[in-house]
A protein has these predicted regions:
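A glycine/threonine-rich phosphate-anchoring loop and its flanking beta-alpha core
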Residues: 15, 113-203
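Residue-level signal for inorganic ion chemistry
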Residues: 17, 39, 128, 166, ...
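Buried hydrophobic packing segments
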Residues: 84, 111-115, 185, 247, ...
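Non-catalytic interfacial helical region
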Residues: 85-102, 111-126
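Short glycine/serine/threonine-rich phosphate/pyrophosphate-binding segments
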Residues: 106-113, 134-135, 245-246
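C-terminal charged capping/lid subdomain of soluble metabolic enzymes
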Residues: 183-186, 278-351
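Active-site segments that bind and position negatively charged phosphate/pyrophosphate groups
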Residues: 198-305
């Protein structure tokens, strides 16, 4: 078993091994000591794994109450989280009880947010079931929902007590959803690891999936430990996300997936960096070629002016502009604050 410890307060472990899902109850029991659990999942994941996880939890003596919501970003809104909180209240859950999130990024974000606000905060465990959630969203404590004005504008930092990653669950992912997660993996290569990026260029990621997950999560772990609440270095993890979130908003969080949008955003911001001379020439093309290897989109049909306009609601905006995560070359990243009036010029050569 591969194990990482995230040294925040409270610290927690990330466990990675094929077959861990069958041990869910035993593992959860090590960190959640209450009597009741809300098992939160969606309509895609619960039919696949929900009953077996529920049985595993019940075998440890928990009373388990499953809450299953409609799968997809369309459900990631305040009302869904309020429904979860009311569900937990109806079941008589107390501060000693907990939440188990079984699903992808949307599930983890909402279940974690519900846990953060129910009774002013109860413990929760992440069991991510998509590549995207295993390598990114399940780690770091960011929880929340979308608003009509933009993505992830309502939320809280609430660290899980444990993250259980079973790579076997990725076998049920379609190629599309596997590629969706690759967008975040490629991001880690772009901002921190030229060797990971090169390996993704030259090998099949499914041949080294546990190593891939471990390296991605370890990269995020280090950044989160250094900057838990995103006051500095953690903003590097937003590489491609400012443009990406704007694109998701323009598609009403439906047509273009998060990983696809981030991929497009990485190409856009790398090209913008090349335009103003702070990113090595050819970097955007290299990212584009790697995304295309996984059949991912590399451009959006919306005019750049519309994408820039949609950035106005980005949570990283200040009164002086937007803080962009950028790269000087593959594997080296930095933060650049760009005044709003200079952003169109920076993206000016992107068609």
């Amino acid at each position: 078993m591969k194990k990482l410890t995230v040294n925040v307060n409270p610290k927690y472990d990330i466990l990675i091994e094929k077959g861990l899902l069958s041990m869910a109850g035993e593992l959860v029991k090590t960190v959640l000591t209450g009597k009741k659990l809300a098992l939160i999942s969606d309509t895609n994941v619960y039919p696949l794994y929900g009953e077996s996880v529920k049985a595993s939890l019940e075998a440890q003596g928990y009373a388990v109450y499953e809450y299953v919501f409609r799968a997809g970003e369309v459900s990631k809104k305040p009302q869904t989280v309020l429904d979860m909180v009311e569900f937990m209240a109806d079941k008589g859950m107390t501060r000693g009880d907990g939440v188990v999130a079984l699903g992808g990024g949307v599930c983890g974000d909402m279940a974690g947010f519900a846990a953060s606000i129910f009774l002013r905060g109860i413990d929760f465990v992440q069991i991510p079931t998509t590549l995207l959630s295993q390598v990114d969203s399940s780690v770091g404590g960011k929880t929340g929902v979308d608003l009509p004005q933009g993505k992830n504008l309502c939320g809280a930092f609430h660290q899980p007590r444990l993250v259980i990653i079973d790579p076997n669950v990725l076998d049920t992912l379609t190629d599309h959803f596997f590629a969706d997660g690759m967008g975040e993996v490629i991001k880690y290569g772009c901002i921190k690891s030229s060797s990971l990026f090169a390996r993704l260029e030259n090998e099949n990621p499914k041949d080294f999936i546990e190593d891939l997950i471990f390296e991605s999560v370890d990269t995020k772990r280090i950044v989160v430990e250094n900057d838990e609440k995103e006051h500095g270095e953690r903003a590097l993890l937003n590489f491609g996300h400012t443009c990406g979130h704007a694109i998701e908003k323009l598609w009403n969080f439906e047509t273009v997936s998060h990983g696809e949008a981030v991929g497009i955003g990485m190409v856009m911001i790398a090209k913008a960096g090349e335009n103003i001379g702070i990113t090595e020439q050819g970097t955007a093309d290299r990212i584009k070629t790697l995304l295309e290897k996984y059949s991912m989109k590399t451009e959006d049909i919306h005019p750049v002016a519309e994408i820039i306009s949609a950035m106005n609601a980005d949570k990283k905006r200040t009164d002086k502009g937007i803080k962009f995560a950028m790269i000087s070359k593959i594997g080296e990243s930095f933060i650049k604050s760009v005044p709003m009036e200079d952003i169109p010029k920076m993206f000016g050569e992107i068609e």
